[in-house]
Amino acid sequence: MTSDGLKPELEKLYSHIEEIEIAMMTTRRADGHLQSRAMATQRRAAGADLWFVTLEDTPKLRDLAADPHVNLSYYKDRTREWISVSGIARLTRDRDKIHELYAPDWKAWFPKEADPRHGSKDDPRMVLIGVDVHAAVFLEVNKPQPVVLFEVVKGWLTGSTPDIGEMHHVRK
């Protein structure tokens, strides 16, 4: 796909992610097992396709140091739309980028200890995880809710797959 052809699909992807906000980030632990945890997707900014913030001393950072491949999954219960993103994570402590992305609600996830900067945009424990998207698949529901419910019930009764939307594939 040309970059011109890719842009509309990427914009759809970003639009759906912004509506859902919380991702389940899956990493591979040192023992080879997969581990998922809820992460709030931050607003879009240059430097990575998707941004997340975390404390510096968490198991996910050890996971990412050993294997930077991640999967991000999103699900919107109301519409049954879902997104699966695979990508490569990069860690940064870039203070300018942290200041650019900082949101007041981060304070809840960075408990105050001895340092008065804790919870602020100057908290030295903050690490950004930038994810560069490799590929994504997402279902865009393009039917009104009553039609979606009808399709689900019809599928349940007939054994056919409900036709509730359009599947999109994005590959960079």
Map each language-model feature to its residues:
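Histidine- and/or cysteine-centered catalytic micro-motif in compact active-site loops
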Residues: R28-A30, L55-D57, Y75-D77, S86-R90
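Conserved beta-strand in the GNAT
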Residues: R37-A40
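Charged, gly/pro-rich active-site loop segments
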Residues: M1-L6, V85-K172
